[in-house]
């Protein structure tokens, strides 16, 4: 396992995990829930 591959996987997982969270936060702020 190269360090570059590990960092890319970590970044991808962070983006995939933060995506729905950001959308949920924006929805809560706008009151669309």
UniProtKB/Swiss-Prot annotation:
It is found in: Plastid, Chloroplast thylakoid membrane. It is a single-pass membrane protein. Its main location: plastid. The chain crosses the membrane at residues 8-28. Keywords: Chloroplast, Membrane, Photosynthesis, Photosystem II, Plastid, Thylakoid, Transmembrane, Transmembrane helix. GO terms for biological process: photosynthesis. GO terms for cellular component: chloroplast thylakoid membrane; photosystem II. It comes from the Eukaryota. Belongs to the Psb30/Ycf12 family. PSII is composed of 1 copy each of membrane proteins PsbA, PsbB, PsbC, PsbD, PsbE, PsbF, PsbH, PsbI, PsbJ, PsbK, PsbL, PsbM, PsbT, PsbX, PsbY, PsbZ, Psb30/Ycf12, peripheral proteins of the oxygen-evolving complex and a large number of cofactors. It forms dimeric complexes. A core subunit of photosystem II (PSII), probably helps stabilize the reaction center. HAMAP family: PSII_Psb30_Ycf12. This is Photosystem II reaction center protein Psb30.
